[in-house]
Each structure stands twice: as C-alpha cells, then as structure tokens.
Design a protein with these regions (language model features):
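Extracellular calcium-associated, cysteine-rich motifs in secreted modular proteins
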Residues: 256-281
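Sec-dependent N-terminal signal peptides
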Residues: 4-12
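N-terminal export signals
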Residues: 12-13, 275
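Carbohydrate-interacting regions of secretory-pathway proteins
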Residues: 16-264
Length: 281
C-alpha cells in the first residue's frame, strides 16, 4: 500500500469531536484550594523574595482565601500574586470572588475595588524581586460601577477578530455587580488559540493569540520577555492589588488529556491530546 492510500485510509477513520466541557461530571473538576491551607500555591509580592508572604497578605480564614492588609502600614507598591504551582495549557478555571473592606493606605487609585486572576503567566520563580507585574494575561475583576472580567495585558499582547489590541485593558460586556457581591467566573483557556471569559456560564469577552510584548510590566528579566513569543501555556495567579478581596470555590477542569476513546482516562470534552495521561486520570 503506497503512502497516499495509507493517508486516505487514516482520513476515512472518524475522528472524535470534542463535546462541550459543560458536560463534564463534577468529579472531573479538581479543587485547587482545600479550604484550609495554601498548599499547592506560592506567594510572590513585589519587592519581596518568592514565598515571602509579607504581613500575611494571603491567608485562609473561614474556608476562603483572603487578601488582607491589616498588618501593613503603607502598601509600598507590594503588588502581589498567589500562584498555583502547576503549569497549564488547555483548561477551564472556575472561582468566585468578592471585594470587602477598604483599600490599604498608599494603594493606587485605579486599584480600588480591583483584583483579578492571571493566566499564561511566566513561572513564579522567574519573577525578579522588584518586578511589579508578572508577564501574563489578566482576567480583571472590578466593582464600583464598572464592568468585570475585563482583560489586561502586562508584558503581553492579544488579538481580537484578527487585529492586535492596542489598549492595555479592554472591557467585557458584563453587567455591573455590587461592591461586596460574590461573582462566579470562569476562564476558558485553549492554549494560544483562544481565551474566553465567562460569568455565570455566559461569555462576556473573547480574544486570541496571546503573546509576549508591549509594556506595563517593569523590573523583569530581559531573558524572559522575548517579544513575539506566542503563549500556549503558563501559570495562574490570584491578584493582590491593595484592595481586600476573597476567593473561594477555586476549581480546574483540564481540557488536555488522553485522546484514545478506548482508554478509561479518555474524555470526550478534551480539546488537546496528551496521551501520556492515557493510563491515569
């Protein structure tokens, strides 16, 4: 059989089409926060070494992760992130957030009622001590009469409808939420192909082809910021930007996995093949 016939034979075999990830059973979702500890997470605050949780900025109280500043005098530009330790490429991240309390003294005006979650972030161990923002893409959480689940791009660029977005932040189409209201959000990340922001299961923003580039991030290692590098994977990080905020019900659905339908580890909603997972869940 010549190569053409082999190719035609392969093309004739029906290929499984991924189903919507909303069909995934709840047991397939992984809890990233155990409600008791910050196990599996690492803190990085600007002007502090990796792992230095100055002032207990990130803490666990009453089953939620809280960003608190009661042990601070002044904010001191200590922009912070709590990173999950696993690198990810194709997934859905779900969580709930709520603002509370007053912004700490010295926090910038734009950071009032402002937080977010970073995706496709550089590895936390590559963030320099005095670096303000990780090179990443941010799903931005806002209150105070503003839309939420916007997108911001510290050290990155994104595309919408085939055009590079020039603005650092772009608003979503969300409704306005109360200042202290719990908001349930999801970020669907499909490698470098697409990122989608959802609230209560409804899409409010979508963009494509995230890559390293642009400004805003400062104090980074030039060896890390290689402009034009397409981002197809990275880390997630919860943000501490001077406003007290709570996070809960942090869950992950991996969309990368076994592509062989005969394997117990196969899932019809997988969109990216990783056949090293065919013997495990």
């Amino acid at each position: 059989m010549n190569r053409l016939l082999v190719l035609l034979a392969l093309l004739a075999v029906p290929q499984p089409v991924p189903t919507d990830w909303r069909t995934a059973p709840s047991s397939d979702w992984r809890e990233l926060f155990d409600g008791k500890t910050l196990d599996g997470w690492v803190v990085k605050l600007a002007h502090h070494e990796l792992g230095d949780n100055y002032g207990d900025t990130f803490r666990v109280e009453n089953g939620v992760i809280r960003v608190m500043y009661d042990k601070y005098g002044d904010f001191g530009a200590r922009f912070g992130h709590l990173f999950y330790k696993q690198k990810l490429s194709h997934y859905v991240l779900a969580l709930e957030y709520r603002f509370f309390g007053e912004q700490v003294k010295g926090g910038p005006s734009y950071a009032k009622l402002n937080s977010g979650v970073m995706v496709h972030s550089q590895a936390p161990e590559t963030i320099l001590k005095d670096q303000d923002w990780p090179i990443s893409v941010e799903a931005q959480f806002l209150a105070g009469g503003r839309t939420t689940m916007n997108v911001c791009t510290p050290g990155t660029e994104i595309f919408m409808k085939g055009e590079m977005v020039k603005a650092h932040c772009t608003n979503s189409t969300s409704k306005i939420y109360g200042n202290d209201e719990w908001v349930a959000v999801e970020v669907e990340v499909l490698g470098s192909e697409r990122v989608r922001h959802l609230i209560d299961g409804q899409s409010v923003l979508q963009y494509e082809k995230p890559m390293i580039g642009g400004g805003v991030a400062n104090g980074f290692d030039p060896a890390i910021k290689k402009d034009g590098t397409v981002l197809d994977s990275g880390y997630i990080g919860l943000q501490a930007e001077s406003q007290p905020v709570e996070f809960r019900n942090i869950r992950l659905l991996n969309l990368s996995g076994c592509s062989k339908p005969g394997s117990p580890a196969y899932r019809a909603y997988f969109v990216h093949a990783d056949d090293t997972r065919c013997t495990t869940r």
